[in-house]
């Protein structure tokens, strides 16, 4: 890494609050070189609508100078159609995907150390004919990763997910010994790489009520989750036996852990978001780079109103800088 962490930020869905929270965050100081990938005219118009006194500059294909609050360096990717805040336009879906692809290329070219993503509208991207499940899956595919892990973080808690954006009925079949071992390996390795934790303590939740109640409420803990945990222990990974999820977040095992591994999206994230929604950060583990994101969606009804909080974006930028600095040690 250079003297300053180098961050590229994708501006997200142009009709949503992505531009709002990015511009709001960049009014704050950060010890980093920061560039935004988006439509510079959309960003300028949004700044005017929000009453922000910002200076924009177009970037050549190299890293920007150290960040100065109120100054925004932009890699310009034009929208195909005019943007109306709060109103989705399928014609601009390709613009959103192109901003992501541009960020990937900048990272692959080693011009940046990390990417921070503003929210996108998955539905309008798919309505345009482009297949898009989410940022996590997109970056995994673009970097050719066999597996990645979604991790959400706030001041008091880290929650990783064994499965991500799946219908609930598909979750049990998606959890295998091999998939859990892969997730545990990634969590163990990246908490060391990005956070400097030499022996991360992982609190692993069960899938079923009361962690299966000895097989009476489901056998996944006996047949899949416990064997995966035992193999992980043999590999030197510090992981608990399956913990009943209903009381897990009050247990000493979780309180003493560095990270919780939840079995599915809505098992672990409601607790984390209840503790710090709007200031939490989404991180993709298992990538050869660093990717962080906000913990909220596009909030179309808030676009250009001045009511969208930039706190999660500021936290995502701060987290990316810290991870980049830890990785360079």
What are these model-predicted stretches?
Residues 140-153:
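FAD-binding core/adjacent interface of flavoenzyme oxidoreductases
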Residues 1-135, 174, 178-263, 267-282, ...:
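Contiguous, glycine/small-aliphatic-enriched amphipathic segments in soluble metabolic enzymes
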Residues 152-182:
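Ligand-binding beta-strand-loop-alpha-helix segment within the catalytic cores
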Residues 138, 150, 159-161, 291:
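Conserved hydrophobic/aromatic beta-strand scaffold that supports enzyme active sites
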């Amino acid at each position: 890494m250079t003297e300053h962490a180098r961050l590229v930020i994708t501006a997200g869905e142009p009709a949503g609050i992505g531009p709002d929270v990015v511009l709001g965050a960049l009014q704050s100081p950060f010890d980093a070189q920061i560039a935004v990938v988006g439509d510079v005219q959309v960003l300028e118009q949004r700044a005017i609508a929000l009453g922000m006194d910002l200076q924009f500059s177009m970037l050549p294909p190299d890293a920007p100078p150290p960040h100065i609050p109120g100054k925004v360096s932009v890699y310009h990717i034009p929208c195909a159609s005019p943007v109306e805040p709060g109103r989705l336009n399928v014609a601009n879906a390709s613009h959103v995907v192109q901003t992501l692809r541009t960020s990937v290329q900048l990272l692959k070219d080693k011009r940046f150390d990390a990417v921070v993503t503003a929210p996108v509208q998955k539905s309008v991207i798919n309505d345009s004919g482009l297949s898009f499940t989410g940022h996590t899956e997109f970056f995994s595919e673009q970097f050719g990763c066999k597996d990645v892990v979604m991790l959400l973080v706030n001041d008091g808690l880290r929650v990783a997910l064994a499965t991500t954006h799946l219908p609930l009925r598909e979750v049990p079949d998606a959890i295998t010994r091999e998939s859990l071992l892969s997730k545990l390996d990634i969590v163990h390795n990246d908490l060391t790489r990005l956070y400097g934790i030499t022996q991360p303590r992982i609190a692993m939740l069960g899938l079923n009520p009361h962690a299966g109640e000895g097989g009476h409420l489901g056998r996944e803990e006996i047949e899949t989750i416990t064997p995966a945990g035992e193999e992980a222990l043999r590999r030197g990974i510090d992981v608990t036996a399956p913990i009943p999820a209903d009381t897990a977040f009050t247990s000493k095992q979780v309180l003493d852990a560095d990270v919780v591994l939840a079995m599915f999206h809505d098992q672990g994230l409601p607790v984390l978001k209840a503790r710090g929604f709007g200031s939490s950060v989404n991180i993709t583990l298992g990538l050869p780079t660093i990717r962080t994101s906000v913990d909220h969606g596009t909030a179309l009804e808030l676009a250009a109103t001045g009511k969208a909080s930039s706190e999660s974006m500021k936290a995502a930028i701060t987290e990316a800088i810290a991870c980049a600095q830890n990785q360079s040690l």
